[in-house]
Amino acid sequence: MATLALSVAGQFAGALVGGPFGATMGRALGALAGSVVDGWLFGDKPEAPAFDIRLGSSAEGAPIPRLYGWGRLAGNIIWARELERLGGETAGAKGFGGGEEEEEIGASFAIGFCEGRVARLGRIWADGQLLDTRGLTLRFYHGDEDQLPDSLIEATQGPGNAPAYRGLCYLVVENLPLRRFGNRIPQISAELCRVVGELEPSIRAVTVIPGATEFGYDPTPRLRLVGPGQGVSENAHLAAGTSDWTVSIDELQDLCPALEHVALVVSWFGDDLRCAQCAVSPRVEAAARTVEGTSWSVAGLSRGQVPVVSTHAGGPAYGGTPSDASVLAAIADLKARGLRVTLYPLMLMDVPAGNGLPDPHGGAEQGSYPWRGRITCHPAPGRPGSPDRTGAAAAQIAAFLPGYRAMVLHYAHLAAAAGGVDALLIGSEMVGLTTVRGAANGFPFVDALVALAAEVRAIVGPATKLTYAADWSEYSGCQPAGEKFFHLDPLWASPHIDAVGIDCYMPLADWRDGDGHLDAALSASGHDLGYLGGNIAGGEGFDWFYADPADRQAQRRTPIADGAHGEPWIWRYKDLAAFWSRPHHDRPGGVRAPTPTAWVPGSKPLWLTELGCGAVDKGANQPNIFGDDKSTEGGRPHFSSGLPDGLIQRQLLRAHHRHWRDPANNPPGMLDPERIYCWTWDARPYPAFPALGEAWADGPNHRTGHWLTGRLGAMAGDELLAAIARDWGVELAAEAGAPLVGGYVVAGPARARDAI
């Protein structure tokens, strides 16, 4: 009786002090006190469970923080239900009786974090330890202004009595077992991201890598068996019981609300820069490996039927080719998320150091792990004895084609097996092959791509868009020794090709340290959006060029001109508008051909099949450069210190998106703004990648690399200031981009001036 009486009294008193939350807590405390009185009066009931409950605390009237970007925030209990028994077990020996019954007690409560809208709930900590959320019932509310009351809160409080906590980001935890927390509600904190910058909502397409990952694209968590009764996670390194793919793609969609397209990169491997000797095939990390519930297979080949990747620094130089089953599962998952899939076959070169292979470019041996764009005839064009411009060059390319065609046609069939994809690329950046000439100034590899496009079209049907991702130095033609050939025009004009694909890594800066360089007169900072945006259709590659490295060092700039025919645009790789809108006339031997090529001006849109920049000092000077110690291609941009700089990466992407959204720069039908594919997002979730060196060897490259993983959600300084101003309802003109801010919290009520 005392239990009932005191619980009612406690509920009434608590309601006077703390409203609905106080009533709930008062009732729980009253019930506990009443049970003690009942024990004094009537004695303990021997069948009653024994437990000791300590209730967590909640700060009434605590200030609500405002979050900008990423932050780990401690929660405040805003609602709680009475504790519940979840079932009991006996502590004594099984079957012998006499054991003391220990019941598990569960708590249902809501934790408020900050003002919304919060895009992403990441990891959760309880009492400072990562919380394993498997088996828990959690519901996250982003803090939308139109969010509805939680179903549990409404069921407990009654219809119409449950607050929706609109504008508040909060988490509902249902029946959390408390024994492991000392029979109390633990202190909860969470990793959150409130996106406030302009970049993330601008991103509508992105590439997903690593491309070389046997099961990394599998949405199902997999266990690799390493011994009798022993296993290690194959593809779940951050959230227990959830695949890396699921965690990573969830975060990508949370951070980029306008995302429509994902280009899924899948890699086969070449083993020689001499095209006639280059075998193209899928590869694996190890010749023997057992993964529970699945097995590796690509194009009907099993693990034991394909080469193993080379080793570097004591481990595999690459991951293996994605298993076909994992690619099909990834495509299905992306479609289920409402995303459109571009399938992106991409060659990697597995040529280790000390290979001893003759170098078509004249080196002592082929460089280690080179770029696929260096595959060419042997010797390369311009080298003594080169077969370029002869039938022998065409014969060398013909020897390369079977393996290459097998890769592309396999993924065409895989796309069809997946029920179709939105788009498929038939290659990328094969510039060393597309520019090789056969007899009579023909381009045999381009002819092969035209034929391949027709074969792929017959497999995938008319609904799948096809293109080739040309290097930024390749898409608009080649110019050997005073000549000009729009060598890819037969491909761009093919009825089976739907767009002109460009991997866009054009320089947007010529920045140096100090203020004594030429561009210092244009801007106070190399991060300035106006400066970077002005170089998208200006500066190097549009107005001028450097004839050699000595000129670059001295900043001796040669204007781009065309005195003979008044067509300077044909030499400008940055003049996308002129390339798209005008007829193309080759200039064999420097003489302008009277008849234009097959390209019809304005006939097809341009896609930026890749757009990116390394997160490195002066990255905009050479956006194509990346750091990789194992590869001879690794390096640092011109005049760069090599130090990390995530801001320049962000600013370059912002500048491009601003530029191409402007109709003055992008007339209708020219560059499809939906098809600016940012390079790149990783299926390996941050921070597991890059932190887990035992799982992935390329983690150190993330520090200055092109990854958006681990960087999206941060803010340039002007984005942060603008967001604060919006929240306070004031206008603020902020132009300076620096610094890059990962996260910022305004802890409570403050003036705009103080927050800034």
Question: Where is each model-derived feature located?
Answer:
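Short amphipathic alpha-helices and their capping/turn segments at secondary-structure boundaries
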Residues: 194-199, 246-260, 327-337, 409-418, ...
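Aromatic-rich peripheral "rim/lid" segments of glycoside hydrolase catalytic domains that contact
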Residues: 618-722
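Noncatalytic carbohydrate-binding groove/subsite architecture in carbohydrate-active enzymes
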Residues: 389-423, 428-611, 615-624
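Substrate-binding cleft and catalytic face of glycoside hydrolase catalytic domains
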Residues: 206-225, 260-441, 452, 459, ...
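Polar, S/T/G-rich
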Residues: 2-4, 8, 24, 28-217, ...
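Short linear interaction motifs
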Residues: 99-114, 230-257, 310-327, 406, ...
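Well-ordered, non-membrane alpha-helical segments in soluble/globular domains
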Residues: 238-249, 320-328, 402-410, 442-454, ...
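A solvent-exposed, charged loop/short amphipathic helix patch at secondary-structure junctions
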Residues: 219-235, 276-317, 362-397, 515-570, ...
